[in-house]
Structures are given as C-alpha cells and as structure tokens.
C-alpha cells in the first residue's frame, strides 16, 4: 500500500487534542474523516506528535497508507477542500510519497516547538487562544540564561506530567532559547522527543524567573530535585506550537 507523508497546520483551540477519542472532536478524527470522504476507506493516521487540547501546529507530520497510488497534489487538494467545507481549522500544507518503512513518529530525529507569550499590560483581543498573556514585565535575558541550565541530558521528572506515559524521564534537550520580538516573547525548544507537558512546564517555570521570583539556581535546583512539586505552574496550551519535525 502506498504510504503518504502529510504536513499539517492547525489551530488546536477548538479540538480535544490530536488523538482520536470517542465522542470528542479531535484533529485525528477530523483528518481521518476527510480521508474517508476522499478515498472511501477507513484509514488510520500516525503522527509525529500527539498534541494536547488547545495546542497548535504549523509543521505537524502524519502518515497514512492508501490502497491507490494517488497523485500527491490530488490528495492535498481533496483533503483541504473537505476540511474547509466542514469548517475545520486544519490545513494540509504538503503531501509526499514516502517509503514503506517511513514512520511519522518513530522515524523522527528532531522535533521543534515554539511557545508564544504576549507580554504587555493590555490583554489580547485577536489571538487570545494563540498566546499566553502575561501582563507583568518579564526579564528575557534572565529567562534565557536560566533556560541554559535545562539544556543537555537530564532526568526531567520535575518537568513532566504525573500522567506522562513515557518509560523514562531522561531526555536530551538540544536547545532552549528565549528571545523577545516587540511585545512577544518566544521560547524555542528542540529535541528528539519531549515528555508530556515538558515544554509547558518549562514555560511556567521560566516565567517565575522572568518576574524575579526564581533565580537560575532555583530552576537548576528544581531540575535536580526530580520532584514534580518543585515545578512552576504549567503554562496554558494556547501558547504552544509544534513547528517542525526532522527526519
């Protein structure tokens, strides 16, 4: 069966996450319904990242096996037409033929995420579901310097959800940059894989540094404590974007 790689963009605000769930509106169920409408087949998609409810993507990747070897542009255009007609906030950006051994999840060698903070006194009127609004002034330089304490291979128990299903809390964080562009602050994270709520936990803890409540040493101590209770607040999903997956 021909395997196709789909690159996706979506606003996750009105979805109960990626993963198909009974009686809930999810990205996977909406995409697979579009695939069924196009092909007449009940097919299952596999994704690089099972994003949570409210999390967005500008470069999510999934794969699906069709029985027929369609033209890639035909797949893209047909799926987009159906998704748009249904009022879904999902777009298929690109479709590629890939070998049978390509796996959107397990073939990935790097995942890139961006977390957006709106740092101003006035609340957002347009992008309220696409940023984390923090009215208190944030010290971006302090946040970036503290973030470097998290880079490298560590036991990230402090920064993962209590419901995380990963067998090991050890991950290698390749980059964690914090920078400002006008009123927006961005956290850029890069690793082969991440734990459940890891980036949102980073964002919430770095906010504590930004407002001056924590120092870089406090963040480092929280990391080494390997204790979920030592984490700062978990930032809301609205600011998180899966931007790219490398293979």
Swiss-Prot record:
Keywords: Isomerase, tRNA processing
Active site: 52 (nucleophile)
GO molecular function: RNA binding; tRNA pseudouridine(38-40) synthase activity
Entry EC number(s): 5.4.99.12
Substrates-to-products reaction catalysed: uridine(38/39/40) in tRNA = pseudouridine(38/39/40) in tRNA
NCBIfam families noted in UniProt: hisT_truA
Alphabetical list of PANTHER family matching this protein: PSEUDOURIDYLATE SYNTHASE (PTHR11142), TRNA PSEUDOURIDINE SYNTHASE-LIKE 1 (PTHR11142:SF0)
Protein name stated in the entry: tRNA pseudouridine synthase A
């Amino acid at each position: 069966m021909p395997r196709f790689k789909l690159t996706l963009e979506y606003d996750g605000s009105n979805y109960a996450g990626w993963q198909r769930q009974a009686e809930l509106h999810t990205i996977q169920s909406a995409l697979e319904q579009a695939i069924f409408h196009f092909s007449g087949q009940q097919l299952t998609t596999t994704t690089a990242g099972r994003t949570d409810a409210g999390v967005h993507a500008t470069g999510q990747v999934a794969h699906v096996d069709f029985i027929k070897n369609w033209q890639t542009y035909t797949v893209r255009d047909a799926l987009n037409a159906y998704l748009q007609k249904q009022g879904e906030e999902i777009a298929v950006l690109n479709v590629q033929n890939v070998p049978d051994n390509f796996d959107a999840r397990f073939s990935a060698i790097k995942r890139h995420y961006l977390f957006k903070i709106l740092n101003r006194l006035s609340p957002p009127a347009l992008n309220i579901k696409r940023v984390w609004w923090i009215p208190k002034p944030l010290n971006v330089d302090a946040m970036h310097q503290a973030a470097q304490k998290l880079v490298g291979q560590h036991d990230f128990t402090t920064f993962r959800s209590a419901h995380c299903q990963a067998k090991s809390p050890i991950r290698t964080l390749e980059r964690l940059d914090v920078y400002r562009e006008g009123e927006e602050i961005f956290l850029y994270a890069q690793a082969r894989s991440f734990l459940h709520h890891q980036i949102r936990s980073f964002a919430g803890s770095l906010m504590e540094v930004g407002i001056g409540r924590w120092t870089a040493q406090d963040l480092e101590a929280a990391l080494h404590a390997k204790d979920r209770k030592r984490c700062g607040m978990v930032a809301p999903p609205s600011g998180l974007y899966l931007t790219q997956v490398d293979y």
